């Protein structure tokens, strides 16, 4: 029963971490506090993802409490590390999926609006790819 609670906690914590990453990529930078607060007040998808991610970190606490009552601490830490692996695998899979899809069609859906998330994501991926190419050439 403890393993089940641990796996539930891992799933919720992983989703929370992905949700927080999603929201932070779309909200204004924290370096500009007034813009960030205004972004929070807009109640966009990014704001909801931020609050869901924060709640997602609180919920697993009760799951871990139930897990620790029935499992040894060494096994519990192994379950906890599974969350980091899961987030990494999902993130890499999404990047590969987006790189194999027709990028022009995704970007075109946003039209000329630079605030469209797909356009921002594609611009970030393109700049990351350019940096990687430049670093490979330099080395």
From Swiss-Prot:
Pathway annotation: Bacterial outer membrane biogenesis; lipopolysaccharide biosynthesis
Record keywords: Cell inner membrane, Cell membrane, Lipid A biosynthesis, Lipid biosynthesis, Lipid metabolism, Lipopolysaccharide biosynthesis, Membrane, Transmembrane, Transmembrane helix, Transport
Keyword Cell inner membrane found: yes
Subunit architecture: Heterodimer of ArnE and ArnF.
Protein name, entry field: Putative 4-amino-4-deoxy-L-arabinose-phosphoundecaprenol flippase subunit ArnF
Gene Ontology CC entries for this record: plasma membrane
Taxonomic lineage: Bacteria, Pseudomonadati, Pseudomonadota, Gammaproteobacteria, Enterobacterales
Biological process (GO), any one: lipid A biosynthetic process
Signal peptide: none
Function noted in UniProt: Translocates 4-amino-4-deoxy-L-arabinose-phosphoundecaprenol (alpha-L-Ara4N-phosphoundecaprenol) from the cytoplasmic to the periplasmic side of the inner membrane.
Family per similarity comment: Belongs to the ArnF family.
Transmembrane segments: 2-22, 34-54, 68-90
Superkingdom of origin organism: Bacteria
Location in the cell: Cell inner membrane
Bilayer topology annotation: Multi-pass membrane protein
């Amino acid at each position: 029963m403890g393993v089940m609670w641990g796996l539930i906690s891992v799933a919720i914590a992983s989703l929370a971490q992905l949700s927080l990453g999603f929201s932070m990529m779309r909200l204004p930078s924290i370096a500009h506090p007034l813009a960030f607060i205004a972004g929070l007040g807009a109640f966009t998808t990014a704001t909801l993802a931020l609050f869901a991610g924060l709640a997602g970190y609180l919920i697993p606490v009760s799951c871990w409490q139930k897990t620790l009552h029935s499992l040894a601490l060494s096994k519990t830490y192994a379950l906890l590390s599974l969350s980091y692996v899961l987030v990494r695998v999902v993130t890499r899979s999404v990047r590969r999926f987006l790189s194999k899809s027709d990028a022009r069609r995704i970007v075109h859906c946003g039209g000329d609006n630079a605030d469209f998330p797909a356009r921002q994501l594609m611009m970030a991926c393109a700049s990351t790819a350019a940096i990687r190419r430049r670093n490979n050439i330099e080395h």
